Structure formats: structure tokens, C-alpha cells
């Protein structure tokens, strides 16, 4: 699947948040999103199957203007905020038996910016995480027709990574009298290291 979208005054995330943590948006003038999505599913054998999803994209603002040091500045062509150019995911399924199933899940998200001005302080680094899902089906043939036991190990390799955050700018008008200096900053949302989820499904 491919897409080619041109926008006039697209609403994009600024990277900033309001007083209660909601993300702010702004019109970005002319912009575009061009991409290719690839999905693939392969059954290697009666026991193994693989599913892959890849998204390649170019997400650009054509002319971004912003106030810098008290004057309007044209940043020109920049990356749209929170829009990585590469996202890939993969799942490997192993059917050990009719009742026991293992699924190894992987996801990669490329570098992205939290601003629309490509500021170094707004970069979110790429990350790669893996999960493991285990499911076991019991068929007691008594009270329940079946009992499904599910275990999910998130972030199997205990990776420390950041997937989201916020970015802001402010004008320093007090350090040097009569001069405006635009400064910036960022906050980050670290994700959980290895964690576990268990679930049960009872079918009558």
C-alpha cells in the first residue's frame, strides 16, 4: 500500500502540552506525507509462521515559520513532528502443540522530532523492543468448555527507552536588558522495563 498526501494548513503537533498535559496543535502551512506500507505473512511450516509490517515515509513541512529571538524566522523544509520515517514490526509464531503457543514480537521505531523545526533538543531516539506472548489452552470438559491462560512479557530484554515526550520554547527577556533570547527544553516519558501481564479466559 502506498500513499501521497498534500496538505494546506495541516494541523500538526507542536510538541508542547497545555496545563493539564494535553498536546497542542498548530497549522503548518503546506506539508506532505508520502509513504509505503508493506505487510507480509509467511507460513514456514505447520509449527512456524512469520508476519512482518514495514512503513517507510517522508513527512515534511514545506515552510515553517517561528519566532526566534524576537524575530520571525523561516526554517524552510523540516520534518513533521512525531513522524518517524521508518516503523517496522515482526511476529514469529511457534505452535508447540494444539494447546501451547508462543509468539515473539518485535518493534522498531526510527528517530523522530517532537518539534516542527528539527531542533536537536526535540529528538526522540530510535528504539527496538521485544515482547513474548505465551498462551495455553485447557479443556477440562467439566464446568468450563475451555480455559485459556495467557502470559505476556513486555520488553523482554529489559530495554530502557523513551517513546514520547514534549518540547517547548520560551523567550528570555530578563537576562540581557532590551534583548530577547529564545530558549528551548524538553521532557520525556520513559517506558517500563520488563513487565508481565497474565490473563484468563473462561468459556462455558
Positions of PLM-derived features:
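Asparagine-centered polar/low-complexity signal
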Residues: 1, 27, 53, 130, ...
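Solvent-exposed loop segments that connect transmembrane elements
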Residues: 12-24, 62-77, 166-186
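Extracellular/periplasmic, surface-exposed regions of secreted and cell-surface proteins
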Residues: 10-13, 25, 38, 198-203
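Gram-negative outer-membrane beta-barrel transporters
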Residues: 3-8, 24-116
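Conserved C-terminal beta-signal and adjacent last beta-strands/turns
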Residues: 78-204
